[in-house]
C-alpha cells in the first residue's frame, strides 16, 4: 500500500527513465524540419561527419539526438516509414544498456536501426542477434537499403558459411546472425591454428532480439563443440533390451499404486533413480546378458561406464517422448526445441542420452562425442563491452536480467492504447472435455468470420487438435517443427477472415499477423504485378481487414498454460497489435502437465465434491490466481537452475578465459623460444627434484632412476653416475646446471639441422597441439567432477566450494602437464630435415580439418547444473601481469598462469 502511494507521488523508476528520455525525443522532433531540407547526399555525408567527431573525442551518447534524427529521415526516404516517438524512446533504452519491453507489432525491427547505426559509428562493429536464420536473413535484407543509404555495410552470419565469408560478415559495420552461430564462432576462433583462421573481431555491442528467449529460455543449455569418441553402440543396444523389464514406481497416493517399483521418476528435476528392488533386478539382468560378472555390483568403481549407460537408457525411456521431445525422420532422431517447437537439425544431446534414444527407437546409433569446447550464453554475452535487448515480454523476468546480466528492464509505452480482451481461464476435469470445448469455441468464432490462432505446447498436442478439427470439418493450417519451411507464409495469412491456425510454442515469432491477411505476400507471389493488380489486391485486403475488425479481431486460444507466464504472454501478444481489437482465452484440464505437477490434488478433489458434470468448466479468479502461483514456482525453480549453472560455469569460465587468453597470445607471436626456455628450466628442476631432493645427502639420490627418466622422457643420454665418480667435488647445484646445459646443447644441435625459423614454427605447433589436447581432457574431467560433486553435501561439505577447490587443483595439474608434455615432445621428436616439419604441420592441419568435419554443435540438456559465486566479468579484457590470476588462486597472473606466456 505504502509502495503504491510513493509510486503515485514520485512515479516509478520506469516513469522517471522515460521522462528523462522524452526530453531527447523533443530535441529530435525539433530537428526534423532541418533534416527534411537536406539533400540525399548531405544526409549521407552526416555519417562521415559523426565518425570524425567521435575520432576527435566526442562521445557516442552526445550524438543521440542528431544521429536518431538522421536515421528517422533516411527511413522516411528509403522505406516511406517514420519512426514513432515511442520507437525513438525504445532506441534510447537499447543504447542505454537496457532491455526494452515493446509490445508485439510496435515495430521492434525498425526501432533496432537507431542504436545499431549509432553504435556502428565507432567502427568497432555491432552484432544484431536473432533466434533463427530466417529472421537474421529477413532483417538484414529488409534493413540493408537503409544502412547502405547511410554509408554503413551490412553482413549476415549464417551456419555453414566458409571462413572468408564469415570474416567479411564480421568486418561489416552491422552484422546479423543467430545467438548459436555467434557463440560457436567464438569457440571455433579459440580452436584456430593461425590468426588468419579467426573470424570474429573484438566483441563490442550486441543487440539481442527476442532477448527473453535467448538469455533466459536457452541459458540452461551450454553451447558445446564436440568430436567423436570411441564406439560403444553395442552396449547401448544391450542395455536398451533390459529397460522394458523394469516397472515405474507410482506415487503412493495414486490410483495405480502397486507397491515398490524398479525406478522412480522426478518430473520436476527430469531425473530417474533406481530403487533398491530395481537395482537387484537390473544387476540380475546384466549378469544374464553377460554384460556384468556374477557377484559384481553396478556401483563398483569398475562399472562406472555401465552405470552411465543404464541411467541414459532409463532417462530415454521414462523422460523423453517421441513427437514431444524429439521426432524420428529418415532414420534419425531429431531434437525438438522445447521453447520454440522447432526441430534442431544436427544437434545432439550429450552424456550418451542421444545414443540411448536412438537405441530405444531402433535407428542407427551414432558415436558418442567428446567435448572440445563449451560456453554458456550467459558467459558468452557478458564478453561484450555493451549488451542490450528487446522483446514483447520481459517484465516478468526483470529480476533475472538485472541479477545475472546487470540489465535493467524498461517498459516502452505502446503507440496506441491496447484494447485486447483477455478472458479468464476455463478449467475442465479431463483433456477430452477441454479439446471439445476448444472445437466449439473455434466453430462459434469462425462462423462470425473471426480468425483464430490456437497455441499448443508440443507437436503431439497440435496434432491432437488438428485431428479433432478435421473430424469437425474445419479447414486449418498447422505450424510446428514438422512444417518449418513455410512458417512465415502461414503466419502472415493467419489473420484471414475465419482462418484457423495451430502453432506450437509460438513458432513464427517475429512475423506479424495482419488482420485480413498480408497483401504484401499476395503481391510477392505474382511474377510481374501491374499497378492495377496491386491496387485491386489492396482494395480486396481492405474489405477483409474491415470485416475482421468488425468480427472482433484475432482470437487467441491457449490449449494449456506454459511453465512460464512470459510464454503465455507471448502467445496473447500475437493479438491486439497497434491498437487493433482482439481477444484471448486459455483452456485447461486437470490432466495438463502443469496442473498435474504443481496444482495440488485438493483442486481436483474440490471440483469432484462440487459435483461438476462432464463438459462443465470452472471459471473463477481464484483458479487463475492458483495457476499463476504454480507458474511462479516453476519460474523460480528454473531461475535457480540457471543461476546454479552460471555459478558453476563461472569457475570453468575463469579457466577458459585464462586458456583462451594464453592461446591467442601464442597464435599472435611467431617466436615462443623464450617461453620454451623458461618452462624447460621448470620441467628439468621438477624432474631432478624427484630423484635428487633439494639440500639432501648424496646417499639419498636415485641416479639410475634419473638417468632412465631423462632417456625415456627427454631422449637425453647422460653419464651422470660417471661424472660423480670422476669428479668427487661435483655438488648438487653444479650437477643441476650441467644437466640443463646439456639438454639445451642437444636441442640447439637439433635446431641447427632444420634452421631457427622452422624450429620456431615447430615449437609453436607443438605448444598449440598439446594445449588443445590437454584442455579437451580437462573439460571431460571437469564434466565428470561436476556430475558427482553434489554428493559432497552428504559429507557436510559445500559442493560449490569443493568444486572450486578441486577444479583449481585439476587446472594447476593440467598446466604442469602442459609444460612437461611440450618439453618432452620437443626433446623426443627427431627432426632432420625442414621438409619433415612441413609434413608434420600438414598432417596436423589435415587432422584439424578432419575433426572440424566431424564436429557436432550441440545444445546440452543440462538440468543437473551446479555452480560458484564469482562476480560477472564484463568484456574480454586483457589480464595485466600484476593483476590477480582469474583462476582464483590468489597469486599474481605472472606468477601463476601467466608464466606460460
Swiss-Prot record:
Chief location category: membrane
Root EC class: translocase
Subcellular location: Cell inner membrane; Cytoplasm
Residues at which ATP binds: 87, 105-109, 512
Co-factor requirement: Zn(2+)
Catalysed reactions listed for this entry: ATP + H2O + cellular proteinSide 1 = ADP + phosphate + cellular proteinSide 2
GO biological process, one term: protein import
Keywords: ATP-binding, Cell inner membrane, Cell membrane, Cytoplasm, Membrane, Metal-binding, Nucleotide-binding, Protein transport, Translocase, Translocation, Transport, Zinc
Membrane topology value: Peripheral membrane protein
Keyword hit for rRNA-binding: no
Pfam families according to UniProt: P-loop_SecA (PF21090), SEC-C (PF02810), SecA_DEAD (PF07517), SecA_PP_bind (PF01043), SecA_SW (PF07516)
Annotated InterPro entries: Helicase_ATP-bd (IPR014001), P-loop_NTPase (IPR027417), SEC_C_motif (IPR004027), SecA (IPR000185), SecA_CS (IPR020937), SecA_DEAD (IPR011115), SecA_motor_DEAD (IPR014018), SecA_preprotein_X-link_dom (IPR011130)
EC number(s) reported in the record: 7.4.2.8
Cofactor binding, per record: May bind 1 zinc ion per subunit.
GO MF assignments: ATP binding; metal ion binding; protein-exporting ATPase activity
Induction: Repressed under conditions of excess protein secretion capacity and derepressed when protein secretion becomes limiting. This is regulated by SecM.
Record: residues binding Zn(2+): 885, 887, 896-897
Source superkingdom: Bacteria
GO cellular component: cell envelope Sec protein transport complex; cytosol; plasma membrane
Assembly description: Monomer and homodimer. Part of the essential Sec protein translocation apparatus which comprises SecA, SecYEG and auxiliary proteins SecDF-YajC and YidC.
Role of this protein: Part of the Sec protein translocase complex. Interacts with the SecYEG preprotein conducting channel. Has a central role in coupling the hydrolysis of ATP to the transfer of proteins into and across the cell membrane, serving both as a receptor for the preprotein-SecB complex and as an ATP-driven molecular motor driving the stepwise translocation of polypeptide chains across the membrane.
Family: Belongs to the SecA family.
Protein name: Protein translocase subunit SecA
Source species of the chain: Salmonella schwarzengrund (strain CVM19633)
Amino acid at each position: 500500500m505504502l509502495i503504491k502511494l510513493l509510486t503515485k507521488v514520485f512515479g516509478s523508476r520506469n516513469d522517471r527513465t522515460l521522462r528523462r528520455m522524452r526530453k531527447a525525443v523533443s530535441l529530435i522532433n525539433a530537428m526534423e524540419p532541418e533534416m527534411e531540407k537536406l539533400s540525399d547526399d548531405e544526409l549521407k555525408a552526416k555519417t562521415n561527419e559523426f565518425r570524425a567527431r567521435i575520432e576527435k573525442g566526442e562521445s557516442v551518447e552526445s550524438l543521440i539526438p542528431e544521429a536518431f534524427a538522421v536515421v528517422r529521415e533516411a527511413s522516411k526516404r528509403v522505406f516511406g516509414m517514420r519512426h514513432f516517438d515511442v520507437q525513438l524512446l525504445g532506441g534510447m533504452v537499447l543504447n542505454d544498456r537496457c532491455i526494452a519491453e515493446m509490445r508485439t507489432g510496435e515495430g521492434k525491427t525498425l526501432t533496432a536501426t537507431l542504436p545499431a547505426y549509432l553504435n556502428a559509428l565507432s567502427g568497432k562493429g555491432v552484432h544484431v542477434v536473432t533466434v533463427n536464420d530466417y529472421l537474421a536473413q529477413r532483417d538484414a535484407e529488409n534493413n540493408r537499403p537503409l544502412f547502405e543509404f547511410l554509408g554503413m555495410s551490412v553482413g549476415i552470419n549464417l551456419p555453414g558459411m566458409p571462413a572468408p565469408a564469415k570474416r567479411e560478415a564480421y568486418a561489416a559495420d552491422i552484422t546479423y546472425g543467430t545467438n548459436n552461430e555467434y557463440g560457436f564462432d567464438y569457440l571455433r576462433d579459440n580452436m584456430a591454428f593461425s590468426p588468419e583462421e579467426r573470424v570474429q573481431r573484438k566483441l563490442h555491442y550486441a543487440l539481442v532480439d527476442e532477448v527473453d528467449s535467448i538469455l533466459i529460455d536457452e541459458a540452461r543449455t551450454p553451447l558445446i563443440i564436440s568430436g567423436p569418441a570411441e564406439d560403444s553402440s553395442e552396449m547401448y543396444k544391450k542395455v536398451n533390451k533390459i529397460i522394458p523389464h523394469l516397472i515405474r514406481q507410482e506415487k503412493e497416493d495414486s490410483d495405480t499404486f502397486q507397491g515398490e517399483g524398479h525406478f522412480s521418476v522426478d518430473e520436476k528435476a527430469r531425473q530417474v533413480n533406481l530403487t533398491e528392488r530395481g537395482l537387484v533386478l537390473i544387476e540380475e539382468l546384466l549378469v544374464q546378458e553377460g554384460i556384468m560378472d556374477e557377484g559384481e555390483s553396478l556401483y563398483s568403481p569398475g562399472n562406472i561406464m555401465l552405470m552411465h549407460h543404464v541411467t541414459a537408457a532409463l532417462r530415454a525411456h521414462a523422460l523423453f517422448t517421441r513427437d514431444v521431445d524429439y521426432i524420428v525422420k529418415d532414420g534419425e532422431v531429431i531434437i525438438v526445441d522445447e521453447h520454440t517447437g522447432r526441430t534442431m537439425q544436427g544437434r545432439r544431446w550429450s552424456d550418451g542420452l542421444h545414443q540411448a534414444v536412438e537405441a530405444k527407437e531402433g535407428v542407427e546409433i551414432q558415436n558418442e562425442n567428446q567435448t572440445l569446447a563449451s560456453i554458456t550464453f550467459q558467459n558468452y554475452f557478458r564478453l561484450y563491452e555493451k549488451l542490450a535487448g528487446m522483446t514483447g515480454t520481459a517484465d516478468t523476468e526483470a529480476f533475472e536480467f538485472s541479477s545475472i546480466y546487470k540489465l535493467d528492464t524498461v517498459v516502452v509505452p505502446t503507440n496506441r492504447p491496447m484494447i485486447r480482451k483477455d478472458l479468464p481461464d476455463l478449467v475442465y476435469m479431463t483433456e477430452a472435455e477441454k479439446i471439445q470445448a476448444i472445437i466449439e469455441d473455434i466453430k462459434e468464432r469462425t462462423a462470425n468470420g473471426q480468425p483464430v490462432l490456437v497455441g499448443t505446447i508440443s507437436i503431439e498436442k497440435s496434432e491432437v487438435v488438428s485431428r479433432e478439427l478435421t473430424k469437425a470439418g474445419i479447414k486449418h493450417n498447422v505450424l510446428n517443427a514438422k512444417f518449418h519451411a513455410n512458417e512465415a507464409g502461414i503466419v502472415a495469412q493467419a489473420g484471414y477472415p475465419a482462418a484457423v491456425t495451430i502453432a506450437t510454442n509460438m513458432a513464427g515469432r517475429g512475423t506479424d499477423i495482419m488482420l485480413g491477411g498480408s497483401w504484401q505476400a499476395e503481391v510477392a507471389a505474382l511474377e510481374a504485378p501491374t499497378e492495377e493488380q496491386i491496387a485491386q489486391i489492396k482494395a480486396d485486403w481492405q474489405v477483409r481487414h474491415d470485416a475482421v475488425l468488425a468480427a472482433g479481431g484475432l482470437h487467441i486460444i491457449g490449449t494449456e498454460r506454459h511453465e512460464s507466464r512470459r510464454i503465455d504472454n507471448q502467445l496473447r501478444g500475437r493479438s491486439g497489435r497497434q491498437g487493433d481489437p482482439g481477444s484471448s482465452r486459455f483452456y485447461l484440464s486437470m490432466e495438463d502437465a502443469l496442473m498435474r505437477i504443481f496444482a495440488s490434488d485438493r483442486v481436483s478433489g474440490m471440483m469432484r465434491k462440487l459435483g461438476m458434470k462432464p463438459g462443465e468448466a470452472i471459471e473463477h479468479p481464484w483458479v487463475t490466481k492458483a495457476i499463476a502461483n504454480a507458474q511462479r514456482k516453476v519460474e523460480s525453480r528454473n531461475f535457480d537452475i540457471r543461476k546454479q549453472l552460471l555459478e558453476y560455469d563461472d569457475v570453468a569460465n575463469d579457466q577458459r578465459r585464462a586458456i583462451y587468453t594464453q592461446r591467442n597470445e601464442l597464435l599472435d607471436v611467431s617466436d615462443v623460444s623464450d617461453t620454451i626456455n623458461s618452462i624447460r628450466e621448470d620441467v628439468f628442476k621438477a624432474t631432478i627434484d624427484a630423484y635428487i631432493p633439494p639440500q639432501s645427502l648424496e646417499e639419498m639420490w636415485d641416479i639410475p632412476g634419473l638417468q632412465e627418466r631423462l632417456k625415456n622422457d627427454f631422449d637425453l643420454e647422460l653419464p651422470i653416475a660417471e661424472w660423480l665418480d670422476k669428479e668427487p667435488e661435483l655438488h648438487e647445484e653444479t650437477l643441476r646446471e650441467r644437466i640443463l646445459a646439456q639438454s639445451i646443447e642437444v636441442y640447439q644441435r637439433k635446431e641447427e639441422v632444420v634452421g631457427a625459423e622452422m624450429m620456431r614454427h615447430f615449437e609453436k605447433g607443438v605448444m598449440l597441439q598439446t594445449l588443445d589436447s590437454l584442455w579437451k581432457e580437462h573439460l571431460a574431467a571437469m564434466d565428470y567432477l561436476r556430475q558427482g560433486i553434489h554428493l559432497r553435501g552428504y559429507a557436510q561439505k559445500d559442493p560449490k566450494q569443493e568444486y572450486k577447490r578441486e577444479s583449481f587443483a585439476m587446472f594447476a595439474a593440467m598446466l604442469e602437464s602442459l609444460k612437461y608434455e611440450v618439453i618432452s615432445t620437443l626433446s623426443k621428436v627427431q627432426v632432420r630435415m625442414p621438409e619433415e616439419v612441413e609434413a608434420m604441420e600438414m598432417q596436423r592441419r589435415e587432422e584439424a580439418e578432419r575433426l572440424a568435419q566431424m564436429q557436432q554443435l550441440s545444445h546440452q540438456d543440462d538440468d543437473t547444473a551446479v555452480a560458484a559465486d564469482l562476480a560477472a566479468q564484463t568484456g574480454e579484457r586483457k589480464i595485466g601481469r600484476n593483476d590477480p590470476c582469474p583462476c582464483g588462486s590468489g597469486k599474481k597472473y605472472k606468477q601463476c598462469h601467466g608464466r606460460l606466456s
